[in-house]
């Protein structure tokens, strides 16, 4: 490691060099302006001398690298607010031009060139080479025997271009004329960065020999090579003009197509090629009538699978190869990466070092960026393609991954920045490093410095929060589109590398991207959090509160422009905000340790970590199946979903998660937006989901017996249902047959399973006839998982964490197998297997229901199987009935038995059913016992588990787009239902009768406490002294208002009202607060004006609407002739406004005393309650609402001015009683008084 950064820096004084300090000269008379800057500089920028486009682009590097090591001219863009002595009218917008000088950085009173390498640098450096110059200390020659690999690259080298490197002849032969080279990137135990270039790996594919010979008239393998070379030379373009038959090698082997039992072994040509590009062209274009096999397998996968024991993440050892050949060290001037040492070798020079499990001292960078729009509207959402929208700060935290120690804190700032003393003291008190503040005059210099840090320090792992969808795309777009900086040299490769972001689609209105950087593994904690935990909001602050019990000092985005323009002290507040974001993300990273689980999946699947993160579940199973198929003599055919290699292209159809996996609701998926985007759904049998086309019937769900159950409900769960079905019934591509004659020589039932799926008969041979490849994979994985879990109790805490991540990774891959077969456009689809799995699952649910109902219908039958049941009898009649079945869970209602006894006996009952009905390894397990259960609908229930814990599934009691008042009331009602035995008993009695009966009779007396909550809620809603903040609703502005299809949304109404009032409008991704107000004449007039404003905005060009100079007047309505339908006087009745039109900004409503719409809020409360409690009334929402309203008095709500007059006249409001009888007595008394 080559370090170039110091410790705490002295604070800058008046004489210190500061970014933009005296740099800009305000416009004025000749000779006017500030005095000389603190440090002497030349070529001060004048925006009027060199406008954009009049100068040449910055000169690029001339060495064998493409990162910037020299730069003497660049495009200069900086906000005018940094010119703090200029008059206010001159401080809007940005400076934009070209500047002739080296990029500068200022830190702690010092100034230096960004690209200069030397002692005393401002940031740490680990790279040995910079700009073609070796900066290693004298005598630096580390010995490398053992090294850890974390990433694997592949590229194509040409012998002609590598002659000067003085490689050994065997390496030159491997790339003559071209050849694929696998590069292993890693770290030695001593911390030296190493790159091992492995020569001799070749990709290959298969074609049926008989078909090839018939179509191409081939008599020998060489003939096939000649035909392929000729086809390539005749291809469009000049890429393959020099191809000859020597580029290929063909041999004849015996293999079996993996599809169908009746497929017999045959002879195939195995064709080796020297580059993935040639392979891809041949598989796509050479003799399309001939089926290709395994043509989409990249070189990295071949390297791992063709060398038994090799892994994508783990320890390797260099050793002598065949004929005692040794690995060849590369001379520093021949390095292709920013490593400390590089070697050339072949695969036989490598061996796995199995005795080491710890990770070396890899480095983790956690970063966050802050941006600001620079146009006329500084509150607009920044767009990377706009030169005036700038990155103003970047926080960078550098950790040691093995020790979790935070080693460096860096803050890149556009303009001068003074962090608050309180923040520095807080960091010091926590034992964290003092931040190093790096200041810059222009955005280019700051971005170049950041990328230079990325190159020189070279963190192996990078994390942040939503960096894949925002931070990295914004930075890369800035660098490539605005500043024309080549990025292919900023990963571990010095040139011809990959540093790219792909947009791979939308999810819940949220853009989804993937990133690939050579030698840098990006793990976005936003994706990790949304996968691991379910929260109502995934904003970083909400996640920190829920997971870390920590809370950041939030800074509103709309405050950033003002803070930034004020000066260094306020820019320091932004810097503190930026640093604390990175600190929180770092804490989340070490809380979840995602790299351990991801690396375990990568090792198991034989793919690198980047593919594990971004390439879905399909590739994980495919590579494992590919390895096993080769061992068993099978080959896998290419499909439409053939995956690409590490060359960078993303799969055409990225695989989604399994349909039966629960996905957390993402930030921004508000109810109104789901309604807006809603449309007709496709039929159940043919769904397309993020690239998945599923063409078979899904899992069986036994319809729930909705209601409130106060007797114990035992929940049995199938352990690993789908994997166990595949194992038990030997399901696979290779054991399937669609033809009865193919299994005619076998004995039905004994030798094969016959099953009808979707009206078609399918046959699967048993394991003794041919063992399923999928079963072998699952058996080996589960045995490995069991062995790993058994080691955890005896392990050290550190090793236990690693082992737990490994067993979790195996579980994830096992659960991917079923989904792998069921994706029609996947890598190796077999819908018959997937459909058979779900069919057997449905039959198992039905068989379990029939068995339980028949076997334990009477208590005596239960006693016969379980004598201990005699001690668990509870008062009341006995019965056992299944009330719900959902894919892999069965809910059994047990009357007359105690919850404690059922909990103790549940596993025995599950084992009994498993032995009686299912083949191993299928087994039921007792998952939990509910003491009370409100079963609402499929996948929606609330229950209290034996022991007191409440479990809520599919029901949002606390919704992020509901107001606090409704959320609190809903939760209070649920707690009352489950924890008040009087209410629970009354609710159970209520649910046992048809809902219609309660329309004509009083509700049970035990519901009085339940009704009291509703009465109190109604009182608080109608209370003139209510706190309006309790009634604020929110919705996310997921995109620009102009991009919404449905404009009649409450939060859009507020957006346009704010714009009309020339107030600060929310930015995209902000949650817009609003309240629903009463309809008044003033509200009606505002709505009319807003309609005109919406029309103006819809017609306006550009990305952001400009506020109107004056509010548009509503369109004049023509005089109407009074009709018989009009009210007296001829005035037409006002239109009842939509709820979305009644939305108002809470701050405006409070300031102007705007009345709330109490009817709306109570209806909203009743609606929320009905969704949850309709199960008490036969799931009839209309009857539920009608009965709940019984608790509330029918009262007239006069307008506020009328109510004030009534109170002044001595009238008072009389509330309703808690019951209908009490209300009747009060009314009787009132009428007697009036009489």
UniProtKB/Swiss-Prot annotation:
GO BP term (any one): viral DNA genome replication
Subcellular location: Host nucleus
InterPro entries: DNA-dir_DNA_pol_B, DNA-dir_DNA_pol_B_CS, DNA-dir_DNA_pol_B_exonuc, DNA-dir_DNA_pol_B_multi_dom, DNA/RNA_pol_sf, DNA_pol_B_thumb, DNA_pol_palm_dom_sf, DNA_pol_type-B
Molecular function GO labels: DNA binding; DNA-directed DNA polymerase activity; nucleotide binding; RNA-DNA hybrid ribonuclease activity
UniProt catalytic activity: DNA(n) + a 2'-deoxyribonucleoside 5'-triphosphate = DNA(n+1) + diphosphate; Endonucleolytic cleavage to 5'-phosphomonoester
Ranges of Acidic residues composition bias in the record: 662-675
EC code(s) of this entry: 2.7.7.7, 3.1.26.4
Chief location of this protein within or outside the cell: host cell
Record carries keyword Nuclease: yes
Gene3D superfamilies in the record: DNA polymerase family B, C-terminal domain (1.10.132.60), DNA Polymerase, chain B, domain 1 (3.30.342.10), Helix hairpin bin (1.10.287.690), Palm domain of DNA polymerase (3.90.1600.10), Ribonuclease H-like superfamily/Ribonuclease H (3.30.420.10)
Record-linked SUPFAM superfamilies: DNA/RNA polymerases (SSF56672), Ribonuclease H-like (SSF53098)
Keywords: DNA replication, DNA-binding, DNA-directed DNA polymerase, Endonuclease, Host nucleus, Hydrolase, Multifunctional enzyme, Nuclease, Nucleotidyltransferase, Transferase, Viral DNA replication
Transferase keyword on record: yes
Assembly and oligomerization: Forms a complex with the ssDNA-binding protein UL29, the DNA polymerase processivity factor, and the alkaline exonuclease. Interacts with the putative helicase-primase complex subunit UL8; this interaction may coordinate leading and lagging strand DNA synthesis at the replication fork.
Family recorded in the similarity comment: Belongs to the DNA polymerase type-B family.
Stored PANTHER family: DNA POLYMERASE CATALYTIC SUBUNIT, DNA POLYMERASE DELTA CATALYTIC SUBUNIT
Name of the protein in its database record: DNA polymerase catalytic subunit
Organism expressing this protein natively: Human herpesvirus 1 (strain KOS)
């Amino acid at each position: 490691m080559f370090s170039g950064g110091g410790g705490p820096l002295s604070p800058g004084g008046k004489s210190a060099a500061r970014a933009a300090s005296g740099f800009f000269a305000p416009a004025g008379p000749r000779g006017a302006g500030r005095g000389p800057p603190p440090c002497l500089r030349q070529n001060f920028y004048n925006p009027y001398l060199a406008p954009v486009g009049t100068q040449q682009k910055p000169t690029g590097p001339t060495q064998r690298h493409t990162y910037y090591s020299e730069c003497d001219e660049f495009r200069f863009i900086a906000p005018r607010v940094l010119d703090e002595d200029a008059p206010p009218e001159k401080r809007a917008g940005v400076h934009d031009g070209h500047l002739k000088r080296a990029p500068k950085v200022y830190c702690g009173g010092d100034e230096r060139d960004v690209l200069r390498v030397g002692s005393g640098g401002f940031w740490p450096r680990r790279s040995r080479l910079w700009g073609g110059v070796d900066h290693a200390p004298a005598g630096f020659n580390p010995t490398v025997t053992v090294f850890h690999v974390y990433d694997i690259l592949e590229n194509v080298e040409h012998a002609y271009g590598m002659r000067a490197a003085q490689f050994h002849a065997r390496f030159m032969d491997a790339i003559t004329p071209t050849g694929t080279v696998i590069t292993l990137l890693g770290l030695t135990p001593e911390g030296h960065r190493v790159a091992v270039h492995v020569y001799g790996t070749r990709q290959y594919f298969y074609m049926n020999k008989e078909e090839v010979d018939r179509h191409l008239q081939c008599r020998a393998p060489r003939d096939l090579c000649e035909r392929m070379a000729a086809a390539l030379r005749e291809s469009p373009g000049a890429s393959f003009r020099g191809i000859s038959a020597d580029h290929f090698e063909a041999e004849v082997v015996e293999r079996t197509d993996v599809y169908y039992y009746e497929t017999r072994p045959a002879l195939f040509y195995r064709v080796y090629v020297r580059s993935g590009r040639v392979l891809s062209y041949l598989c796509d274009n050479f003799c399309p009538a001939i089926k290709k096999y395994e043509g989409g397998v990249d070189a990295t996968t071949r390297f791992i699978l063709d060398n038994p024991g090799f892994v994508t993440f783990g320890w390797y050892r260099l050793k002598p190869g065949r004929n005692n050949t040794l690995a060849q060290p590369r001379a520093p001037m021949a390095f292709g990466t920013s490593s400390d040492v590089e070697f050339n070798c072949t695969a036989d020079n490598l061996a796995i070092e199995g005795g080491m499990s710890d990770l070396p001292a890899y480095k983790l960078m956690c970063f966050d960026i802050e941006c600001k729009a620079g146009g006329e509207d500084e509150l607009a959402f920044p767009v990377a393609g706009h030169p005036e929208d700038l990155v103003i700060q970047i926080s960078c935290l550098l950790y040691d991954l093995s020790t979790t120690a935070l080693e460096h804190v860096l803050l890149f700032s556009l303009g001068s920045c003074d962090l608050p003393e309180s923040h520095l003291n807080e960091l010091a008190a926590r034992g964290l490093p003092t931040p190093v503040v790096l200041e810059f005059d222009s955005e280019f210099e700051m971005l170049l410095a950041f990328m230079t840090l990325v190159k020189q320090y070279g963190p192996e792992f990078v994390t942040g929060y939503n960096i894949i969808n925002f931070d990295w795309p914004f930075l890369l777009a800035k660098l490539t589109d605005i500043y024309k900086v080549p990025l292919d040299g900023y990963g571990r490769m010095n040139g011809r590398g990959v540093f790219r972001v792909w947009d791979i689609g939308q999810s819940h209105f949220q853009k989804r991207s993937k990133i690939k950087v050579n030698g840098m593994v990006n793990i976005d904690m936003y994706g990790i959090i949304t996968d691991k935990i379910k929260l109502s909001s995934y904003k970083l602050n909400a996640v920190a509160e829920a997971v870390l019990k920590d809370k950041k000092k939030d800074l509103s985005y709309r405050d950033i422009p003002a803070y930034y323009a004020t000066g260094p002290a306020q820019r320091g507040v932004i810097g503190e905000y930026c640093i604390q974001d990175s600190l929180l993300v770092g804490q989340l990273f070490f809380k979840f340790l995602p790299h351990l689980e991801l690396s375990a999946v990568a090792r198991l699947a034989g793919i690198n970590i980047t593919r594990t993160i971004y390439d879905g579940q399909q590739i994980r199973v495919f590579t494992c199946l590919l390895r096993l198929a080769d061992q068993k003599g099978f080959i896998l055919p290419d499909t439409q979903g053939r995956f690409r290699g590490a060359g960078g292209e993303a799969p055409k159809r990225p695989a989604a998660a399994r349909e039966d996996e629960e996905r957390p609701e993402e930030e921004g998926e508000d109810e109104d937006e789901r309604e807006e985007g809603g449309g007709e759904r496709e039929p159940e049998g043919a769904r397309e989901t993020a690239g998945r086309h599923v063409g078979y019937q899904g899992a069986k769900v036994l319809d729930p017996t909705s209601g409130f159950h106060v007797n114990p409900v035992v929940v049995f769960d199938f352990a690993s249902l789908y994997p166990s079905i595949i194992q038990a019934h030997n399901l696979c591509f290779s054991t399937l047959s669609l033809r009865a004659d193919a299994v005619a020589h076998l004995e039905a039932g004994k030798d094969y399973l016959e099953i009808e799926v979707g009206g078609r008969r399918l046959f699967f041979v048993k394991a003794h006839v041919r063992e399923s490849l999928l079963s072998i994979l699952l058996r080996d994985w589960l045995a490995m998982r069991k062995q790993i879990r058994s080691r955890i109790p005896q392990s050290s805490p550190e090793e236990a964490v690693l082992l737990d991540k490994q067993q979790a990774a195996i579980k994830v891959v096992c659960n991917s197998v079923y989904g792998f077969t069921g994706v029609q456009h996947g890598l190796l689809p077999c819908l018959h297997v997937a459909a058979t799995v779900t069919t057997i699952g449905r039959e198992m649910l039905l068989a379990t229901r029939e068995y339980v109902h028949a076997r334990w219908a009477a208590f005596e039958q239960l006693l016969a199987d379980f004598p201990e049941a005699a001690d668990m009898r509870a008062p009341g009649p006995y019965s056992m009935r299944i009330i719900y079945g959902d894919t892999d869970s069965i809910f059994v209602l047990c009357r007359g038995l105690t919850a404690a006894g059922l909990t103790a006996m549940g596993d025995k009952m599950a084992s009994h059913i498993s032995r009686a009905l299912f083949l191993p390894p299928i087994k039921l397990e007792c998952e939990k016992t509910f003491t009370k259960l409100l079963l609402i609908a499929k996948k929606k229930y609330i229950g209290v588990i034996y022991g007191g814990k409440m479990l809520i599934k599919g029901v949002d009691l606390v919704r992020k787009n509901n107001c606090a008042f409704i959320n609190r009331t809903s939760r209070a009602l649920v707690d009352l239902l489950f924890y008040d035995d009087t209410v629970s008993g009354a609710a159970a009695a209520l649910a046992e009768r048809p809902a219609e009966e309660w329309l004509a009779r009083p509700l049970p007396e035990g519901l009085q406490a339940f009704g009291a909550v509703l009465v109190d809620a109604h009182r608080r809603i109608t209370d003139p002294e209510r706190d309006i903040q309790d009634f604020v609703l929110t919705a996310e502005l997921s995109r620009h208002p102009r991009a919404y299809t449905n404009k009649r949304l409450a939060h859009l109404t507020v957006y346009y009202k704010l714009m009309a009032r020339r107030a600060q409008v929310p930015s995209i991704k902000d949650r817009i607060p609003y309240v629903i107000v009463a309809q008044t004449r003033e509200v009606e007039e505002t709505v009319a004006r807003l309609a005109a404003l919406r029309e103006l905005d819809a017609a306006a060009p550009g990305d952001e609407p400009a506020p109107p100079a004056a509010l548009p007047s509503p369109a004049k309505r023509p005089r109407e002739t009074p009709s018989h339908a009009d009210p007296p006087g001829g005035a037409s009745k006002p239109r009842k406004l939509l709820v979305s039109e009644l939305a108002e900004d809470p701050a405006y409503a409070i300031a102007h005393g705007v009345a709330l719409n109490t009817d709306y809020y109570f209806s909203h409360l009743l609606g929320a309650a009905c969704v949850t409690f309709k199960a008490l009334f036969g799931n009839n929402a209309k009857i539920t609402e009608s009965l709940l309203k019984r608790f509330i008095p029918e009262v007239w709500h006069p307008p506020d001015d009328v109510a004030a007059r009534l109170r002044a006249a001595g009238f008072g409001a009389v509330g309703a009683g808690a019951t209908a009888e009490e209300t009747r007595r009060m009314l009787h008394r009132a009428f007697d008084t009036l009489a």
